[in-house]
Structure formats: C-alpha cells, structure tokens
Amino acid sequence: MINLKLFLELKLCFLITLLCSSHISSVSDTFFINCGSPTNVTVNNRTFVSDNNLVQGFSVGTTDSNSGDESTLFQTARVFSDESSSTYRFPIEEHGWFLIRIYFLPLVSASQDLTTARFSVSAQNFTLIREYKPSTTSVVREYILNVTTDSLLLQFLPRTGSVSFINALEVLRLPETLIPEDAKLIGTQKDLKLSSHAMETVSRVNMGNLSVSRDQDKLWRQWDSDSAYKAHFGTPVMNLKAVNFSAGGITDDIAPVYVYGTATRLNSDLDPNTNANLTWTFKVEPGFDYFVRFHFCNIIVDPFGFERQIRFDIFVNSEKVRTIDMTEVLNGTFGAPFFVDAVMRKAKSREGFLNLSIGLVMDVSSYPVSFINGFEISKLSNDKRSLDAFDAILPDGSSSNKSSNTSVGLIAGLSAALCVALVFGVVVSWWCIRKRRRRNRQMQTVHSRGDDHQIKKNETGESLIFSSSKIGYRYPLALIKEATDDFDESLVIGVGGFGKVYKGVLRDKTEVAVKRGAPQSRQGLAEFKTEVEMLTQFRHRHLVSLIGYCDENSEMIIVYEYMEKGTLKDHLYDLDDKPRLSWRQRLEICVGAARGLHYLHTGSTRAIIHRDVKSANILLDDNFMAKVADFGLSKTGPDLDQTHVSTAVKGSFGYLDPEYLTRQQLTEKSDVYSFGVVMLEVVCGRPVIDPSLPREKVNLIEWAMKLVKKGKLEDIIDPFLVGKVKLEEVKKYCEVTEKCLSQNGIERPAMGDLLWNLEFMLQVQAKDEKAAMVDDKPEASVVGSTMQFSVNGVGDIAGVSMSKVFAQMVREETR
C-alpha cells in the first residue's frame, strides 16, 4: 500500500501527463504508465510516465529507447514477488466507466525469467485474470469497469513462490455516452444492467477488409480487419467523406470515421433472390454473457428515391436482434452513423463460437441492400465477478474449474484409498491402452487418407474429425440415433456412394435428412469434411441448408434440411407413385438449380465448382422448389490469373465434362456441361445412360443431340409432355442445352448467361399460360396475379411463379 506522499506524487505525474497529451488534454482521470522503466516514453501522442515512485517491486528490462512505437512499451517490466507491493492505486475524480489496457511480454534477463511467472490480476473486486501463464509473444488485454469509488485499485497477485509482472498500463476515463446503463437481452423483452459488470474486449472489427490502428482512434483502440473472421464474402465499400457525425447525434468517441466510413456489403446484386447472409465467426469462452455492438452508417446510397429498400436483419447465433430499415433510422439521413447494442446470454454449447450476421429481409417486394460498418464484442463478468475462463459457469450449470478446495483432512483420509486405486488404475490403463491401439489400427485401415485428414482424439478418447474446427454445428451421436430410431432401415430414403440417407425427426419435431457415411465409403473422410465446410460457408435459397453434423466415434454424419419431394431424378424417370412434372415445373426447377450454382460460381472472391451436378443432387421441397445438394466433391475455382484448376477427375459417369475428363482441367464451365446433361434429362424424361435401350439410344447425349440437329424434337420429348408444350419453346430450350454441351468449355455459356436464358423461357411459358387462361375464361381477371415479368434482366423476373414459395420461406442464419 503506498503512502500519502506517493499518492500525491502519482497525481502530480498524471496531471503533467495530461498536459503533454494533445488528444486528451481536457480529459481527467487518464493515466499512462511505463512500468519498470526509469524514464518516460511517448507513443502515439501519449506520454507513459515511469512508475519508479508509484509502486515497489523490481524492474527487468532490455534496451530502453523511445522509438515512438508500441514496441517501446515492451522493453521493460515491473516485477512483483509478493502481494503487499503489487498494487497500483489510481485517484478517481469523477465516477464512471474506465478503460484499462494492460501490456504483457515476459522478458528474460540474467536475473529473471518471466516466462515462468504465474499470477492473477484483479480490479475493483473483479477477477480479470486468474493463474495467468504468459505467452511468449506480446499481449494487450483490454477491460472496461464502472468505477464507483474515489480510487481504482489494480492488483497483480503472484502465485506463491512465483512472481507477477506488467510492462505498461493505461487507465482512461471513457465518455459518458460510450457505454449504456443497460442493453437488451437477445431473445427476450428484458434488459441487462451493464453497470454491475466488468467487461473484457474480445474483438473489435472494422469492415471493408481494412484495419484501424490505435493512432487513428481517439481512445487508441485497435480495430481489426473483418477478413479474418468472415465466413462469407461481401463487397468492401469506402466513403469517408459521407460520414456526418452531427446528423447521427454521436461523436467519433463511439468509433472513428475510419470505421463508419468503410463497410462490407452483402453481394445481392448478382442474384437478388439470394437467401444469403454475411456471417463473421469468433471464438469465445463458453459460460459467459457477451455484449455486442453493431456499427452502421449508410455510406452506400440515399435510401429515399432508391429503387431498392435498404432493409435487413441482424443476428447473433441465429437469434434475431433487430430489423434495420434505413428509411426509418435517423429519418433515413445519408451518412448518419448509429449503433445497436445487445447482450447474448451464455453460449448454449461448450464449442465457444459466436456468429454475427446480417441477412436480407425476404418479405419485401424490392431488392434489399444490406451492409455493416463494424462491431465490437465484449465478455461480461459472471456471478463470480470474474472474467477468467477458470471461473466460467457453463450452460449446464457446471463450472470449468476442475480443481477442488478439498480440505487437508479429507485428502489425508483418502490417501490410503488412492494407493489402492493406483494399483487398480495401472492394470486398467494397461488394458485400455491395448484396446485403443487395436482400435487405432482398425481405424487407420479404414481411413488411411494421408496426414491432411487424420481423425483426431479429444480428451475423452472420442474420435473428432473437426476437433479444432470453427464450425459450431456438432451434434452428439446419441441425438442422431434418437432422431433416426437408431438408424432404422425403414427410414432409409436414399443410398449413394457416400452411404445411406435416413429421414429423421429431432426433438423439436423438425424433420431432417441424415446422411451417414459408410466405413467403406468411396467418398470418405476428405469429402465429408469438404461437404460440411462448404455447407457452412454458404447460405442460399437454392442450396440445401446444413443443420448439423456428427463426427463422434469416427462417424461421418451430415444432418440437413429434409426435402419432402426427394430428388429431381425421382420425378423424371424413377417415378414409382410420384406425380409427373409439368413443363412449367421443370423450367422452375432448372431456374432454381441454376441460381444455386450461379451463386456458388460468383458468391465469393474465388468460385466454388460443384463438380457433381446431376439430377440426383437436385432436391425438391414440398413446393417443388429446387436446391442443389451434395458438396463432397466441390472444389475452389482458379485464381484470377489462372484459367483452370488441375485436379484428379471426380464426378459421376455421364455428367463429366469431356475437357475435364481428358485434360484434368476443372473450370466453372465443367458445372455448365453437367447442368446441360441435367437439362437433357428434364426434357427427355430418361436417364443419361440406359443399358436396357437399343445401342444407339443408350447414351442420352449422343442420341438426343443427333435428333436435335436433325430438327426431330418430337422424338426426344418426354411422352408426358407431348401436346402440352410448344415445339418452338422446346427448340429454344434445346439450343441453350446444346451450347452447354459444347466439347470446348470456352464455347459454353457462363452460368449467369444460362440462368438468364432459363428465366426468359420461364417468362414466355408463364405468358402463354396467362393467355390461355384469358382465352378459356374471358370474364376472369388476371390483374391480381402474383406473377410479374419484365425483360429488363434476370433479377426482374427472379420471382416468377414462385412467390408463394418464397413467402413461406423462413430465413435462417448461417453457420
């Protein structure tokens, strides 16, 4: 405890510091400490004063120089060997929120090795860090506390027999408007009182793939680029001149102009009907609540008079926080910054991931534009007044603290029993090791696929393929078995190269499809990982949605949304008792599948090539809306300076691009070729290869294309469609199909061009049906029809005849 003289000296030093700092000359209760150094240093317009007269303890240092950058702060350290001398006391003139920034780097000298230090840090009766084990690299920890006393105590408490240390320290009084008194609890109508909690900064992220350094922020906050956390790809936007703080009623204390003047925008222009999100994934510690702040500033377009509404939803872990409508917020003022605060309660699993998302609002007639400028995530102290994972209270009510405060008497009483247990444990361990080795040899035989795809073990010995993955969708095997009645064979709805697909029902009555990989699966572990990762990267109305996966005990199970009508293949020629598809339905299915593939090809900076497009991988929901499935063979496309990806040939016989088959050169046009084969199946109503037919008809492509070139379209049309579709429409359809099936990829259309042609054909078909309706019932009015068309572009007719389906869609958050 320092005496009154030292206390007054400390106050005097800090008053001098305030006069030396141009940024905060008018702000009281702001302190910068250069710990363990006899001199002051200046970094980013802040003067860090020596703590030689402020605390006891000894110092450790390297070369002490004032280079002006942050590395200067890590050249010395203040070291404490006992609790009595390990406290910094800061006089507080005005109560309120304070930011504490602590710098750590374990220095090594001839007399002291700080890498072995073990200590805890507390402030105002909050545990900030417990049993800290220093990293070998520099670390900056940031905390926010509501100080209601006349002094702020910051203690660095060494473990018995060890030491504690600190390299530099900042204590800043925050503007009153920065932290609210309370914030909304997501998913409830309640608020959480923030003033009774301490906070630790987890992430502070700026959009637009740009970081913001400390010297660009009035409070010297570091804003990381969003590129490291983004699960989807958006378009970066920058417009610093558009930011108008006065219009937003806030100051740049909330966030600097570099945050509000940059944004990441959801790519919705290429496909306005995209049911996609922009999602950022952060690793967090389970067992804590998290305070989240979303920053917004419309620097893109004036919402008034704009043909597209700027209206979108924001989510945290799939739970909706709020709908943002730029025409309502701040009266739609262009360039006016604002923010939205919310609190996410304890993570519902031990995975420890937090997903922040923005997504399109699908219940509006105009195409939405969605964006975000930045966000901040802070961990809130728990009921133990702690911010350390050691004290976490997990969702099931248990504690992460595995230690016990067992009394010495109890330990003595158990010592004899432990000796007996030790002997027994040795025998059991020997038996378990033999059993595990035998099982590992078996698994290596089944999954011998190289170092990149080795099955890992968790602490309980379970095999976990994604043990270090950021994907937070893992389902326990017991839940999967419950949903499928222990993989009852009567629930099998499909069989493929990967394994069997079961229909399942989760506890909340959600129907799901459960794809279980067989041990002898031809696709195997690599394809399983690829499919799970692909399904978590993308969310689109016409791509099947991932619900979860299971890799427990070396299982390879994928759980995705159940598609009531099965596959397109089922409705073309594997009919059984299924109804036949009309020409209109077939066109709608082609359009939907093309949209999904178009999104794969254009929805990110590098295209995703599906590589296994076929009628069996196009699923249909209860309204016959198409969704592309099975991403196990998907491959990232070529870089911008490359034309193709060289890779081993994989796919399904009959659908393979001949250029890819002969040269092993994969491009997006390989998917176009495969889709052309699907288009032939759609119009002909027969499989690609049918050995039961005469030799000249076995191969669908060869047989159909010969007849198309001869103009004998009536010979290839599905008999069910004869007389129900105009030959000129079939002719146009076959012309597009023929281009897709060109031997040379360069002669094939891009998926976007193909989609446009299909949309146009659907438009023509719909107009024909309207005309027929009027002819049959002249008294009927078609003014109220939900089908609207325009030839202005693909986006303008993207909702053709599917408005009812789209209206029923429930938008889900990704990852």
UniProtKB/Swiss-Prot annotation:
One of its GO terms (molecular function) is protein serine/threonine kinase activity. The active site is at D612. Glycans are attached at N40, N45, N125, N146, N209, N244, N277, N331, N355, N401, N405. It is an enzyme of class 2 (transferase). GO terms for cellular component: Golgi apparatus; plasma membrane; secretory vesicle. The keyword Transport does not apply. ATP binds at I493, G494, V495, G496, G497, F498, G499, K500, V501, K515. It is found in: Cell membrane. Residues 429-815 are cytoplasmic. The chain crosses the membrane at residues 408-428. Residues 1-26 form the signal peptide. Residues 487-761 form the Protein kinase domain. Keywords: ATP-binding, Cell membrane, Glycoprotein, Kinase, Membrane, Nucleotide-binding, Serine/threonine-protein kinase, Signal, Transferase, Transmembrane, Transmembrane helix. PROSITE patterns: PROTEIN_KINASE_ATP (PS00107), PROTEIN_KINASE_DOM (PS50011), PROTEIN_KINASE_ST (PS00108). It comes from the Eukaryota. Residues 27-407 are extracellular. It is a single-pass type I membrane protein. InterPro entries: Kinase-like_dom_sf, Malectin-like_Carb-bd_dom, Prot_kinase_dom, Protein_kinase_ATP_BS, Ser-Thr/Tyr_kinase_cat_dom, Ser/Thr_kinase_AS, SRK-like_kinase. This is Probable receptor-like protein kinase At2g39360. It comes from Arabidopsis thaliana.
